[in-house]
Design a protein with these regions (language model features):
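Catalytic domains of carbohydrate-active enzymes, especially glycoside hydrolases
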Residues: 1-11, 155-162
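Paired acidic/hydrophobic, glycine-rich loop segments that form the ligand-binding mouth/hinge
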Residues: 5, 132-134
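Metal-dependent phosphodiesterase/phospholipase catalytic core, i.e.
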Residues: 21-132, 151-170
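Conserved metal-phosphate-binding beta-hairpin within the catalytic cores
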Residues: 5-11, 17, 85, 91
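Short catalytic/ligand-binding loop motif for oxyanion handling, primarily in non-cytosolic enzymes
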Residues: 14, 94, 121-122, 142-144
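Short, charged, surface-exposed secondary-structure boundary motifs
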Residues: 29-30, 141-149
Length: 170
């Protein structure tokens, strides 16, 4: 059991919302290509367990039918699970599709959502006002500045959390 599951969302060429951190499928599957250039049908042909190594260093998930999931499948399979969602990139269609899915599955009260991209985060705030959200990087810097001057209550009353890695390797 977990209290909250953190996932990243991308949008495919055919407008499907998938659960994937990377912009491409190169690292996580036996395929190649950018998510935005591939349909979900094309992505689902590749083995998402191909490169994953278990604790013994074995590729035990290879050839086991593991595919990159649709966000909708996550909402169906885990209806009572709280989700911390990062929207990747700056595609307005991603926000619109995610809004539709979250609304259709009546999941607003179980979602914490945001994007590191400032413009994408503004779309999130506009389209998903009933979800909790976190700050983009530029908002985080402004948050720190405003906090330094003791003005947080005046300027920030809608976000729920700040996500800032203690360590960053990349």
């Amino acid at each position: 059991n977990v209290e909250m599951l953190e996932i990243d969302l991308q949008i495919t060429k055919d407008g499907k919302v998938i659960v994937l951190h990377d912009d491409s499928i190169d690292r996580t599957t036996n395929g190649k290509g950018n998510v935005i250039d591939l349909s979900y049908e094309e992505i689902a042909e590749f083995d998402a367990g191909y490169n994953f190594k278990d604790e013994e260093g074995e590729c035990s998930f290879r050839d086991q039918g593991v595919i990159i999931p649709l966000f909708e499948e996550v909402l169906k399979q885990l209806p009572n699970t709280y989700l911390n969602i990062e929207l990747k990139g700056n595609n307005p269609q991603l926000v619109e599709k995610v809004q539709l899915l979250i609304t259709n599955y009546n999941a607003e009260d179980k979602i914490l959502i945001g994007s590191a991209n400032y413009f994408q985060n503004k779309r999130v705030h506009k389209h998903l006002p009933n979800c909790g959200y976190y700050l983009s990087r530029p908002d985080l810097y402004l948050f720190l500045l405003v906090g330094y001057f003791g003005l947080l209550k005046k300027y920030w009353d809608k976000f729920l959390t700040v996500e800032a890695p203690i360590e960053y390797h990349g």
